[in-house]
Amino acid sequence: MPKQRKTRARPVARRVYSFEQGAADGHRGMKELLGGKGANLAEMCNLGLPVPPGFTISTEVCSAYYEHGKRFPAGLEQEVERALARLERATGKGFGSRDNPLLVSVRSGARVSMPGMMDTVLNLGLNDATAAALAKRSGNPRFAFDAYRRFVQMYGDVVLGIKPASSMERDPFDVVLDELELARGSQHGKGLSADDFAGLVAAFKAIVRERTGRPFPEDPREQLWGAIGAVFGSWQNERAIAYRALNNIPSSWGTAVNIVAMVFGNLGASSGTGVAFTRDPSTGEKRFYGEYLIDAQGEDVVAGLRTPQPIATLEKALPKAWKELLAIQARLERHYRDMQDIEFTIEDGKLYMLQCRTGKRTGFAAVRIAVEMVREKRISSDEALLRIDPDSLNQLLQPVFVPAELAAARGAGRRLTRGLNAGPGAASGRIVYSARDAEHRAAAGERVVLVRIETSPEDIRGMQAAVGILTSRGGMTSHAALVARQMGKVCVAGAGELDIHYGDRVVAVDGQRLHEGDWISLDGSNGDVYAGQIATQPSPVAAALLLDDKAAQRSPLYKSFAQILAWADRARTLRVRTNADQPDQCTVAVAFGAEGIGLCRTEHMFFEGDKITPMREMILSESTAERERAL
């Protein structure tokens, strides 16, 4: 009997990848494994940029998690513990330490950006003991207990599933917070003391016990694994599934999980947080564009909880951080050769980069950025074509308000307020206050405008159904603005004068009250909001092509559009014909570059008006003479 050869056990593929400033286990080419966020964090570390240290659990673990009935694969715990030990060494802090506690964020990261669709937990690692240690070491108990109440609320929502029953109900944690702020005359936590925040922690924990029947978890490692499981679980939540369906993203990709040492923008006047773009994501203009908040955490900006300040004012508020940020954003755009969306936090004057990714943009911006980057010799014309989603060009055809109708609305005093022009075009629709109502009424053929205090990822289907989105909170980088730009929806965000009452289904502004079903109009060019309906007319691109409007043909937007089409004509190897059933359709097709008619369905012509009667007579004719007489 031949002797059997011994075989070695197949080594388990690496599943956890660490990173810190100047060194990383990964790079930007590993998005399939590390997700977009993890790959770009690693890349920024390799560039030597100031990034908080952390580690990424790969997308393969997400796949294994679902394949094994939502259980973590064997050996993962040991890998995470090794990465956690490395993170402790990098920060000089201890996870669960009662002297110098390490806190972490736990964030999702698919290989393509899915803004707000999956879950995040900040300030993880806090409990009664570590919060006291953080208060002592920072010398700032108010900051420590502010972070603690944020953590309990976020963990309660994301991991423990404590949420409003519907979009028309309020978050139970927010109800308690708002009642306290009303009693203290505070807004956005600014008038609350350390004792107030400590009281909120106790109240939030009571909500957790009441809703779950269990106490809030005190063990940081239990918290960590709960958050990791929740982030993997969020890959299959309703809003993520809907977003993937809308954007043709395969469900098999999965998400990575990024565990990163916390840096704090809520330490006081020398701290802050923001989101910015290396170019204007609405227009494509080459200018550093974004928003920030002083004494805040990142979710305050993205979730639209407070209306932030324009990024340019950071130069006066924190000049040293501004100068460094300006240099970094320019370097990142050069490195990636595309417009970048960045997130940052300033902790006691020191800048940290938390994320960079290719920025979502409107069709207007996509065309302008592509054309200008070719002129700047950063990309080729072929690369420019590949960067423009053909569907996004439809946004360039979005209507604008008829000037005379708009002037009449202003003259009649129908202008209600002005917010931030966060999404392109102009639209009128009937007011709805919930995403579900937007879906139902749009399905019935109505044009609706979704009006919310702020949108959340759960509103994704309603946003898709609406012709426009209006929020009273949030800025140009809020969830509403980001998603609206990507969808090409008209959006006005941060219209702070609006007083929205979900229960009464009414919005009050400047002495007027608009009810559900009333008409409202949004001007995406400047952020104006009007009562009633306003007529629209073709966009400058449509006017230039279809109406031979000379002024429109001189517009920068049309010139960029024409340049893209010229490059496309030069690159293509196919001739383009159109399907058209009517003479006016042929005219439109030829104006947009069609070289002929590919298919003409004559039955559509014959079915119009009174043409159907002679056609029937012709078909039923029994002789040539009758047929000729019918025609």
Question: Where on the chain are the PLM-derived regions?
Answer:
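Nucleotide/phosphate-binding sheet-loop regions of phosphoryl- and nucleotidyl-transfer enzymes
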Residues: 2-410, 442, 446-449, 456-461, ...
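Long, charged amphipathic helices and adjacent flexible linkers at domain junctions
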Residues: 244-249, 385-441, 446-448, 528-572
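Structural loop-to-beta junction motif characteristic of Rossmann-like glycosyltransferase folds
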Residues: 488-490
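Solvent-exposed beta-strand/loop surfaces of large extracellular or lumenal domains
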Residues: 492-503
